Design a protein with these regions (language model features):
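Bacterial N-terminal signal peptides that target proteins for export
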Residues: 3-17
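Boundary at the C-terminal end of the N-terminal hydrophobic targeting segment
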Residues: 29-31
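Beta-rich carbohydrate-recognition and catalytic domains
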Residues: 33-236, 247-293, 313-377, 414-419, ...
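Short, surface-exposed beta-strand/loop micro-motifs that present aromatic residues
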Residues: 190, 298-301
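Functional cores that coordinate and move charged inorganic groups
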Residues: 241-246
Length: 543
């Protein structure tokens, strides 16, 4: 095996990446000479060059490796390129379309759009869900519509939106065989329980999000009717795209999907595969702002061999004008561990104060990326003011903070902040509890990027605001992941908000804490710089 082929599958040396997106005519792209960092509100240069031809079906793995390596290296100068999130090797990424573990390695499939091949399948592999390496694109026959992957005992099943099913069993899932029988529907999720295979497919009819089919042999499929059907939780138009049905253990299941009119959602409940019905116990959202405007989009998930339920989403971006094309590329969120909150009862009733029904945490392996910690303790946050945090700055960081709001109305962090505050992103918790005792513990977690960028190419976007229910006396615990143009905020293990931000000033790296109404206290904060998972971006670490 030559050096290039060896490094292609070396998990410790994942490839750099490029997110060059196509214009509609697909004749030219804003491309390989990545734009220089914008100065103030200026626009980056976007020269047009001819697309380099590449036959994804005929070229071998070494050629794929060299092609992807070149594309990833060409993006290294892009100031908004994430250091530790997955992004594709050039061209457009859309829905994640399958996540599974096969023979000890994690595999991610995603919709990928090289020239003339819209919605083909990109493929990456990882040892830890953090460091990724590109694998050759799947055959171009595996395209046109999203789908999911599921690891069976002796093979991996992959669905695509045309109702096609593909299987593979080789170590790196490179050799795919099309199953001879198609099944009805689109946006399908497939799995097996006992002696039956099941497929859920997007529905979108009145009060119906998902339908379910059953088969013993993957050949003859019988419809079992509406799987997720509830007029209160699923309004007309909730189409159940990119759906996943995942076991939470204890007889509970988690449904993830994307609604084109409401965004990504989840349902916790009981799955009765005898009758083909899902009984909803709890319902929630993964995105609380405008759909397709810099937040989470489509999900993919699986249950790991250790029982963890893992979910990942693409971070959609439609707020950037076309002449900032280099910044518009979608990426995949950090992997999240999802579980049912054991403190929630099945029927909350009027007299029980609600809490977030789903726990959400980043995977532990992300801690391997930390370096150069800065620790602060017992910092007073002045009333109606802010306190800059000395020595805490950067564009690719993790912050872990504990804040005691005391009696303040709002507390939080300002990140990616310029010295004069012209650019800043605000993360806050509002203490707007209701007078009713069963809602008095409700708080509002927020990311506000309305002041994040001075660029006229960045369209305005309302804040992302999600509920966070706190126990009596519970402090605010934040884990904030900043990765140049994407921000993920985990709060108390029970809420997570995600947004994109595009600061233009090189000095927009500061962090401060603030309080409104009265004084608060920063109990502790640790800030780490984060290592790049892409070798050619190593020089950007710590900046």
């Amino acid at each position: 095996m030559n050096t290039l082929r060896h490094s292609f599958f070396n998990m410790k040396s994942p490839f750099p990446y490029l997110a060059i997106l196509l214009f509609a005519n697909l004749a030219t792209i804003h491309a390989d000479d990545a734009p220089s960092p914008p100065a103030n509100a200026g626009k980056p240069a976007t020269p047009e060059v001819k697309i380099e031809p590449f036959d994804f079906d005929k070229e071998d793995a070494n050629a794929h490796a060299a092609y992807f390596l070149k594309k990833r290296k060409s993006a290294a100068a892009d100031p908004y390129r994430p250091l530790y999130h997955f992004s594709p090797p050039g061209f457009g990424l859309h829905d994640p379309a399958g996540l599974c573990k096969w023979q000890g390695k994690y595999h991610l499939f995603y919709l990928y759009s090289p020239p003339g091949l819209q919605w083909s399948r990109g493929h990456a592999v990882s040892d830890d869900l953090v460091h990724w390496s590109d694998l050759p694109m799947l055959p171009t026959s595996i395209r046109l519509g999203t789908g999911q992957a599921w690891a069976d005992n002796d093979r991996v099943l992959l669905t695509i939106g045309e109702g096609k099913l593909f299987t593979a069993s080789d170590p790196l899932l490179e050799k795919w065989t099309e199953h001879p029988v198609k099944f009805p529907g689109a946006d399908n999720y497939i799995w097996r329980e006992k002696d039956h295979y099941y497929i859920t497919k997007a529905a979108g009819g009145p009060n119906t999000a998902l339908e379910i089919l059953r088969s013993r042999d993957l050949t003859k499929w019988d419809s079992m009717g509406n799987y997720l059907n509830d007029g209160y939780f699923t309004e007309p138009g909730t189409d159940g795209s990119c759906n996943n049905v995942l076991s939470l253990g204890g007889g509970q299941h988690l449904i993830l999907f994307f609604s084109h009119n409401q965004g990504p959602k989840y349902y916790i409940g009981k799955s009765d595969l005898g009758s083909g019905r899902f009984s909803i116990q709890h319902h929630g959202r993964m995105n609380y702002g405008p759909v397709m405007r810099g937040g989470l989009h489509a999900p993919t998930g699986f249950v790991d061999t250790d029982g963890r339920c893992i979910g990942m989403w693409n971070v959609m971006e439609c707020t950037i004008q076309d002449n900032m094309l280099g910044h518009k590329g979608e990426m995949i969120s950090l992997p999240r561990v999802l579980a049912a909150n054991k403190e929630v009862t099945a029927d909350e009733g009027w007299n029980i104060r609600p809490i977030n029904p789903l726990t959400i945490d980043p995977v532990e392996d992300l801690k391997k990326l930390r370096f150069n910690p800065v620790k602060l303790e017992n910092v007073t946050i002045p009333a109606n003011g802010q306190q800059p945090l000395a020595g805490v700055k950067g564009r690719a960081m993790e912050l872990e903070a504990v804040i005691d709001p005391k009696s303040a109305r709002e507390v939080g962090l300002r990140i990616l902040q310029s010295p004069n505050g012209e650019e800043q992103t605000t993360i806050s918790l509002s203490m707007h509890g209701y007078a009713w005792p069963w809602h008095s513990n409700k708080r509002e977690l927020m990311i506000d990027v309305s002041q994040a960028s001075l660029s006229p190419d960045v369209a305005s976007r309302t804040p992302e605001i999600g509920p966070l229910y706190l126990k009596d006396g519970e402090l605010l615990h934040l884990r904030v992941f900043i990765d140049r143009s994407v921000i993920e905020v985990f709060a108390n293990g029970r809420q997570c908000l995600t947004l994109r931000a595009y600061p233009t000033r090189p000095e927009s790296t500061g962090v401060s804490v603030f309080a409104r109404g009265s004084e608060a206290r920063l109990v502790s904060l640790t800030a780490w710089q984060m290592k790049s998972i892409w070798p050619e971006l190593k020089e950007q670490e710590g900046r």
